[in-house]
Amino acid sequence: MAENRGERRAAVENRYDAWDHEQAMKAAVRKFISYDQFSAQLRNWREARLNIIEHATSVLSQVSNLGRTHFYSRTERFGGSSLVGDKLYVCLNETRMKTALNNIIVALQTVNGEGRARRLGPREASANTGGEDSALNVAHQLAEVDDLLTDESFLREAVFTQDKYELVNGLRWAGA
């Protein structure tokens, strides 16, 4: 009825209050992935352990491109606006996770022989690379990441619900 009388309510813009340069930088740099999606992907990689050598290039690309930055912004809510339940998100920039993922990348690059000639010299680089050792190293690195995903301190520090992330970072969502 209020609209019939010519009165209009000001629409509340969906955005974070108190958004500043620091928040924008965090959003640009931090990479996040759904906990469920990450767990499923990790399980697939671990199950493919015997074929990891054959698929090293593909897995290397997947690990290198894991998660995304700009997961939230001034006008895009962390985790999205239509959340159902307490969906969990993993921050891939947490020190232990970042180190573990970098170790997987190095192990996969070693499978492909990348950097071998530079490290060992041309003569040693042409020798057999030891596929079983490489596969074992990759499997070990994947197990390290799997262990992190159930580590209590990691879960407290680097796994977030929308509410927890906003609380920890002083973000308050305004709007519907």
Swiss-Prot record:
It is found in: Virion. GO terms for cellular component: helical viral capsid. Pfam families: TMV_coat. The keyword Plastid does not apply. InterPro entries: TMV-like_coat, TMV-like_coat_sf. GO terms for molecular function: structural molecule activity. Its main location: virion. Keywords: Capsid protein, Helical capsid protein, Virion. Capsid protein self-assembles to form rod-shaped virions about 21 nm in diameter with a central canal enclosing the viral genomic RNA. Belongs to the virgaviridae capsid protein family. This is Capsid protein. The gene is CP.
